């Protein structure tokens, strides 16, 4: 397992199994506009976050991936094929939906904010994850890699990866924590039905962190033949940039749709954050628009005061996990702590380095809501809008209870409805069954 390390000095040593890696922390940019204009740096840094903390055996593969992505984005044939498949296979563009009854629920005497949903739950496979999986599968084909591995927590990234592998005839192995397999049995069956091998991970807490560690071990062993489709804006460079750029279609569409719907930019963007891919996909095209507030909502689990949570930005400290420097949940010795969330997709003790950076420079805000708040929000949205959101997405909806009373009348709020809740029905039934 890659260890988390507390940083109290300007030089860091990360110990991988038998592989010492050193890195000097870069200084922070002074100018706020400069700080957001070029992300990441040529070294894969978002300020002091990001980088490549991996065994030497992976460095050529990361360099190959970075070069392949750079060339692909400049190739009209690649972008045309990606756009074609996003339309015809994934079902993009996803609509921007005015949630009239949810808006009315939070209405005050002066009118209150207006709430819009970016409907990523309507994508093929039921979540935003297919955007990145499709893009990386096309890159793997360009690199001649025929074997694909992935990690998954809630199972949505695993399903998306298995889906694109079936589409292109690629071998697929998905690593998934045994506890998450129990919680997400439907998605496990979907992956196997699509022809993927689902490899249970029983180490540690048997959740997303441990699945990611096992996927990295596989990649180290089989790097010549295998491409790792990492599912979030985490991991070593170029993954945080690569995954962000494939998901940026979310924010690009939302920007145009807002102009068509109400004639200007939104005032607030709201999204759940585990590793942070759906949030970054929505945020990225708006980062340089200072009038747009960007709010990420983490999982407070049983409450941040209990220690049983996954509120990494809210409660974390700087360290290294899974090849990148970011904020992590750690103990006093720098060991990565167990995370907890009712949502398997948010049950992760780290976060993408760009989120850590945007928080540090004050460009984005981050909050946390509990399991119970997420359940209450899931039920509310289901009853008011006829849309059952994923438990991950429900965390973003839950923050409306705190946010809406603070917003001026006429404020336009866009929530990334990142996934549908079919996969969570059993979990929700266990928690709410006696209340329905």
From Swiss-Prot:
Task: Cite the GO molecular-function annotations of the record.
Answer: tryptophan synthase activity
* Needed co-factor(s): pyridoxal 5'-phosphate
Keywords attached to this Swiss-Prot or TrEMBL record, sorted alphabetically, are: Amino-acid biosynthesis, Aromatic amino acid biosynthesis, Lyase, Pyridoxal phosphate, Tryptophan biosynthesis
List N6-(pyridoxal phosphate)lysine occurrences by residue.
Answer: 129
Question: A single Pfam family, by name?
Answer: PALP
Q: Which CDD domains match?
A: Trp-synth_B (cd06446)
Pathway-wise, it operates in: Amino-acid biosynthesis; L-tryptophan biosynthesis; L-tryptophan from chorismate: step 5/5
Protein task: The beta subunit is responsible for the synthesis of L-tryptophan from indole and L-serine.
The record describes its quaternary structure and partners as: Tetramer of two alpha and two beta chains.
Q: Which NCBIfam families match?
A: trpB
- Name the record gives this protein: Tryptophan synthase beta chain
Source species of the chain: Prochlorococcus marinus (strain MIT 9313)
Q: What gene makes this protein? A: trpB
């Amino acid at each position: 397992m890659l260890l988390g390390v507390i940083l109290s000095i300007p030089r860091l040593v990360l110990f991988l199994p038998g592989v010492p890696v050193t890195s000097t922390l870069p200084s922070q940019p002074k100018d706020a506009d400069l700080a957001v204009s070029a992300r990441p740096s040529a070294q894969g840094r978002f300020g002091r976050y990001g980088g490549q903390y991996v065994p030497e055996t992976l460095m050529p593969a990361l360099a190959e991936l970075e070069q392949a992505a750079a060339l692909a984005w400049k190739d009209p044939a690649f972008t045309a094929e990606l756009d074609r498949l996003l339309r015809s296979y994934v079902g993009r563009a996803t609509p921007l939906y005015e949630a009239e009854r949810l808006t009315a629920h939070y209405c005050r005497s002066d009118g209150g904010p207006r709430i819009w949903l970016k409907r990523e739950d309507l994508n093929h496979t039921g979540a935003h994850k297919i955007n990145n999986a499709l893009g990386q599968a096309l890159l793997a084909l360009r690199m001649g890699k025929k074997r694909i591995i992935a990690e998954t927590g809630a199972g949505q990234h695993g399903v998306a990866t298995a889906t694109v592998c079936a589409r292109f005839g690629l071998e697929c192995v998905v690593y998934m924590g045994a506890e998450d397999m129990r919680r997400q049995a439907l998605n496990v069956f979907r992956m196997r039905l699509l022809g993927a091998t689902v490899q249970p991970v029983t180490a540690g807490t048997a959740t997303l962190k441990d699945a990611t560690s096992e996927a990295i071990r596989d990649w180290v062993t089989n790097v010549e033949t295998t491409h790792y489709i990492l599912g979030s804006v985490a991991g070593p460079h170029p993954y945080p940039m690569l995954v962000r750029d494939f998901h940026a279609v979310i924010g690009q569409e939302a920007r145009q749709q807002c102009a068509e719907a109400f004639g200007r930019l939104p005032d607030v963007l709201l999204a759940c954050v585990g590793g942070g891919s759906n949030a970054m996909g929505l945020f990225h095209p708006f980062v340089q628009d200072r009038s747009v507030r960007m709010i990420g909502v983490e999982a407070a689990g049983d409450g941040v005061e209990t220690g049983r949570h996954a509120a990494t930005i809210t409660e974390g400290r700087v360290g290294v996990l899974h090849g990148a420097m970011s904020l992590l949940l750690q103990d006093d010795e720098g060991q990565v702590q167990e995370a907890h969330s009712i949502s398997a997709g948010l049950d992760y003790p780290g976060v993408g380095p760009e989120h850590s950076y945007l928080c540090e420079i004050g460009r984005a805000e981050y909050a946390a809501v509990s399991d119970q708040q997420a359940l209450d929000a899931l039920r509310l949205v289901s009853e008011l809008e006829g849309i059952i959101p994923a438990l991950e997405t429900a965390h973003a909806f839950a923050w409306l209870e705190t946010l809406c009373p603070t917003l001026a009348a006429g404020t336009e709020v866009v929530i990334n409805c990142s996934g549908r809740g079919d996969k969570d029905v059993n979990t929700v039934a266990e928690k709410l069954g006696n209340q329905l």
